[in-house]
C-alpha cells in the first residue's frame, strides 16, 4: 500500500557546519520527508539516502493528480519493504543539491545573491554531517538502519564509519569505497560538456544552461545502463520517423538519450550537478585514515552489501572488497551479488529480488 499524500518539510540550522575542506557553510537548510510514526523511545527510525540527482521525495504523491510518486515508492509504505506501520522512514535532500537543501543555487545570506561557484566544494562526509543535524532536530539518537544505493550507499558507509554509535546497521547497494579512474573520467567528460557550453557563463547563468547539461546527463544515462539492458530496451532499432540514410536520423537509443538529457535540464540545476559530481569523484571512505582497514576498524554495526552483475560503474568486485575487508577485521558484513541485466540502475529496479534478504537482515538487527 502506498503512503498516500505526503508533504515536504524543511528546517534551517543557524549554526555553521565546518566542511572537510576547512571552509564554513551556514546557515544550512535541509529539505526532508518522513513516513510513518516515530515510536515512544525513538528507536524505529530508518534513514534512506538518495543518489546523485535524487531528492527527498522518496515515496507517495504531493497531490492526487501528481503524475508519479516518489523515486523509491515501491519499497515504502504499509506492508512494504520499509513498512511504515512499523518504522519511521526519513529521506533528506543532500546539501549541494537543488531540491530544497542549501546548494549553489541558494542565496548566500551574506551577499544576497546566489552562491553559484562561490559555494564551497562539499563531500559525501559533509552531506552526512548535515544529516546528523537533522536527526538531532528530530530527536533521534540512533537509527535502526541507514540505507542507500550509489551515492546513497556512500552515505550509508559514512554513517557506519563516522557515526558508529548512531547506527544499528547499514545497507549499501551498488556502491563503492572510492570511484575508479574510469568512473572519474566519465564525470570529467560530463563536466567538459558543461564547461564548453557558452550559456554556462562560468556558473553565473540566469537561465539553466541547456545543451551542456543535457549532454552531461546523456553520458550519465549510459553509465546507469548496461550492454544487455540496452539490447533489450533498444536493440538496433532505428526511429520509424527517420529515413535510414537521413544523416541526422537517430537510433532509438539516441532518441532516449536526447529525450532524457533535455528533460533533465528542466528539473536540475547545472551547478548542483557539477558540485555533486565533484563530491562523487572525491569520495573515499578511507579519506583521513591510513587505509580502508583503518577506516573500517571504526565500524561497530553490521553492514549488508548488494552488488549487481551488470553494474559496470561500480562493479561487484568493489563491493565485495569492502565486505571482505570488514570480515577480516572481525566485523559483521553480508555480501549479496544479484544477477541483473539492469546495470547500475538495478538497485532501483530489483527490489523484489533483494527485499527478502533486507527483511531478514532488519529482523536480526531488531532482535539485537
Curated annotation (Swiss-Prot):
Subcellular compartments: Cytoplasm
Catalytic-site annotation from UniProt: 150, 311, 344
Alphabetized InterPro entries for the sequence: AB_hydrolase_1 (IPR000073), AB_hydrolase_fold (IPR029058), HAT_MetX-like (IPR008220)
Keyword flag Plastid: no
Pfam families cross-referenced by the UniProt entry: Abhydrolase_1
Chemical reaction(s) catalysed: L-homoserine + acetyl-CoA = O-acetyl-L-homoserine + CoA
EC number of this enzyme: 2.3.1.31
All residue ranges annotated as the AB hydrolase-1 domain in the record: 44-350
Record: residues binding substrate: 217, 345
GO molecular function: homoserine O-acetyltransferase activity
One Gene Ontology term from the biological process aspect of the record: methionine biosynthetic process
Record pathway: Amino-acid biosynthesis; L-methionine biosynthesis via de novo pathway; O-acetyl-L-homoserine from L-homoserine: step 1/1
Record keyword Ligase present: no
Main location: cytoplasm
Cited function: Transfers an acetyl group from acetyl-CoA to L-homoserine, forming acetyl-L-homoserine.
PANTHER family: HOMOSERINE O-ACETYLTRANSFERASE
Oligomeric form and interacting partners: Homodimer.
Name under which the protein is recorded: Homoserine O-acetyltransferase
Amino acid at each position: 500500500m502506498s503512503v498516500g499524500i505526503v508533504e515536504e518539510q524543511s528546517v534551517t540550522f543557524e549554526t555553521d557546519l565546518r566542511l572537510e575542506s576547512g571552509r564554513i557553510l551556514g546557515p544550512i537548510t535541509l529539505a526532508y520527508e518522513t513516513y510513518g510514526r516515530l515510536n515512544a523511545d525513538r528507536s524505529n527510525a530508518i534513514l534512506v539516502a538518495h543518489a546523485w540527482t535524487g531528492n527527498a521525495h522518496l515515496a507517495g504523491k504531493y497531490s492526487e493528480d501528481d503524475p508519479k510518486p516518489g523515486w523509491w515508492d515501491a519499497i515504502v509504505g504499509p506492508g512494504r519493504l520499509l513498512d511504515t506501520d512499523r518504522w519511521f522512514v526519513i529521506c533528506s535532500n543532500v546539501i549541494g543539491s537543488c531540491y530544497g537543501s542549501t546548494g549553489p543555487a541558494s542565496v548566500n545570506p551574506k551577499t544576497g545573491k546566489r552562491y553559484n561557484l562561490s559555494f564551497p566544494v562539499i563531500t559525501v562526509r559533509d552531506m552526512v554531517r548535515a544529516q546528523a543535524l537533522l536527526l538531532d532536530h528530530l530527536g533521534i539518537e540512533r537509527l535502526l538502519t541507514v540505507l542507500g544505493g550509489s551515492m546513497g550507499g556512500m552515505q550509508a558507509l559514512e554513517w557506519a564509519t563516522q557515526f558508529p554509535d548512531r547506527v544499528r546497521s547499514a545497507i549499501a547497494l551498488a556502491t563503492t569505497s572510492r570511484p575508479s579512474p574510469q568512473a572519474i573520467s566519465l564525470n570529467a567528460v560530463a563536466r567538459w560538456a558543461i564547461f564548453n557550453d557558452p550559456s554556462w557563463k562560468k556558473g553565473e547563468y540566469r537561465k539553466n544552461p541547456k545543451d551542456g547539461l543535457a549532454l552531461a546527463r546523456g553520458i550519465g544515462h549510459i553509465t546507469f545502463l548496461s550492454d544487455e539492458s540496452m539490447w533489450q530496451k533498444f536493440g538496433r532499432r532505428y526511429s520509424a520517423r527517420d529515413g535510414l540514410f537521413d544523416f541526422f536520423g537517430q537510433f532509438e537509443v539516441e532518441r532516449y538519450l536526447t529525450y532524457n538529457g533535455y528533460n533533465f535540464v528542466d528539473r536540475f540545476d547545472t551547478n548542483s550537478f557539477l558540485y555533486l559530481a565533484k563530491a562523487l569523484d572525491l569520495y573515499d571512505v578511507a579519506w583521513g585514515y591510513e587505509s580502508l582497514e583503518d577506516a573500517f576498524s571504526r565500524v561497530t554495526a553490521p553492514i549488508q552489501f548488494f552488488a549487481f552483475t551488470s553494474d559496470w560503474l561500480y562493479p561487484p568486485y568493489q563491493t565485495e572488497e569492502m565486505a571482505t575487508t570488514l570480515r577480516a577485521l572481525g566485523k559483521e558484513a553480508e555480501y549479496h551479488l544479484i544477477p541483473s541485466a539492469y546495470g547500475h540502475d538495478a538497485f532501483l529496479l530489483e527490489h523484489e529480488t533483494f527485499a527478502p534478504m533486507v527483511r531478514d537482515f532488519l529482523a536480526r538487527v531488531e532482535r539485537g
